Amino acid sequence: MEGAIVFVRSSVPRKYLLALVAALVIFINEVVQAQERSIPKSEAPGPVLVLSNSDTSQGVGFASFSVVNSDFPPGTLADPKQLVEVQWNATYYPESIMEDVKLCYSRPFSSQEDCRKILPNSSGILSDFNVQSFGNGSRVRIYHDVYGGTPRYTRPAGADSVVFKYSY
């Protein structure tokens, strides 16, 4: 049998190859089906009572944006979701002396907040919260700490807004 090539027929390698192909098909199918969606929200923060015309005593106005069941497409509520970014647009209180603004993210149904300082009357994108869980019950609040100003109640110039971008 010199120079002859002998092929051994075995079903074991074929089974492993078939399992590998099946796993790849499932993986590729999951990757292809991943979709990205957005949930836009908008709300005007409330008027703030100004207790003094100085920068030592602040009042707080805020807008709260909660994610609810109806924000998700039908049939996807139970699907795992990953937050991609939070786009934001913050208003300001034009009659105040000074204003500090922060954007805070809360995981689903949690009262703990993870906050980032932002500027009044500005917009931007944050991807700092991507490692945290996201879904029904997640929340963003934009807080406006308003210092001094006239008249007794200072009102915002407009509305705050956020867009939750996520994939599933």
Predicted regions and their residues:
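Bacterial N-terminal signal peptides that target proteins for export
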Residues: 3-18
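Sec/Tat signal peptide C-region and signal peptidase I cleavage site
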Residues: 28-34
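Bacterial N-terminal signal peptides
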Residues: 17-27
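Disulfide-rich extracellular domains of secreted proteins
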Residues: 35-168
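Short conserved micro-motifs at the rims of enzyme active sites and ligand-binding pockets
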Residues: 1-3, 153
